[in-house]
Structure formats: structure tokens, C-alpha cells
Design a protein with these regions (language model features):
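Glycine-rich phosphate-binding loops that contact phosphosugars or nucleotide phosphates
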Residues: 37, 44-135
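Short, glycine-rich nucleotide/cofactor-binding loops
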Residues: 14-24, 115-124
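A short, well-structured juxtamembrane/interface segment
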Residues: 20-37, 103
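Generic N-terminal amphipathic, Lys/Arg-enriched alpha-helix
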Residues: 1-20
Length: 135
């Protein structure tokens, strides 16, 4: 049954994450907790499908306080797929070197803040720019 095969694969991925990344997850959680405890922000950013976790972390009733989503509208999927602000413009923007630096100019950061960047590939220029600026 295909559903069981999917579940088996999903469990395998989770087990691999637990075996290889648990310490890194704990370190990241500590960095974020320290920022929030200091009264500062955990800034979150992603583009394309990676805006979904950013949007889900947006503070609302019953959610965790301390997360600050950085949503750059042209890099979300609130745009059209073709035509005006379509996929070609989106791909250009997420790959344009320097665009992340320009986004970061809109925000004030403190040394006690941290940033969580979501990416499916880790290679798009806008994510790399954002990470370097946050560093």
C-alpha cells in the first residue's frame, strides 16, 4: 500500500534527523530561546514555498511570542504564476545577488536577535544575502 510506504519513508527521515541532527536542533533552540528571553526577536525569512513556515510562525492568539516574520511580498506565493509578477520575476528576484541586503535595510536588528532562514535548496542568493547580513 502506497500510504504505508510513504509513512515508512517519513519515519526513516525522522529517525535519520534524530540520529544526525538532534544536537544541532538543540543548539538552534537554545539560541532562539536566549533571544526571546532577552526580550529580543527570532526573525524568520523564506521565499517561495519556504514562506509557509514563516507565515505559520506569525504571532497570533495562542502562539509563541518572540518570532518576527520577514515577509517580502514579491517572494511569496501571493503573486500570480504567469503575467504580472509571475514565476519568471519571482525566480529572478530570489536569485538576484544583493536583493537580500536591500530587504534587510528595512529592519533594525540587535546583537541579541537571531534569524531563522527557511530554504529548500540553500543556494538562492536572497537567502544567502539575508544570512550574511544577519551574521
Amino acid at each position: 500500500m502506497l500510504a504505508l510506504e510513504w509513512l515508512k519513508n517519513a519515519h526513516g527521515i525522522m529517525e535519520k534527523l534524530e540520529a544526525t541532527q538532534l544536537e544541532n536542533i538543540k543548539k538552534a533552540a537554545t539560541v532562539m530561546a536566549d533571544s526571546i528571553e532577552a526580550g529580543r526577536w527570532v526573525h524568520t525569512f523564506g521565499c517561495g514555498h519556504a514562506t509557509i513556515p514563516v507565515e505559520e510562525m506569525y504571532p497570533r492568539i495562542g502562539s509563541f511570542v518572540g518570532f518576527h516574520p520577514l515577509c517580502e511580498l514579491p517572494l511569496t506565493f501571493f503573486t500570480q504564476i504567469i503575467g504580472q509578477m509571475g514565476i519568471h520575476q519571482f525566480l529572478f528576484l530570489e536569485r538576484a545577488e544583493g536583493y537580500g541586503q536591500e530587504i534587510m535595510k528595512n529592519y533594525d536588528f540587535d546583537s541579541k536577535d537571531c534569524m531563522w532562514i527557511f530554504s529548500h535548496t540553500g543556494i538562492n542568493a536572497v537567502n544567502i544575502d539575508m544570512a550574511l547580513e544577519a551574521k
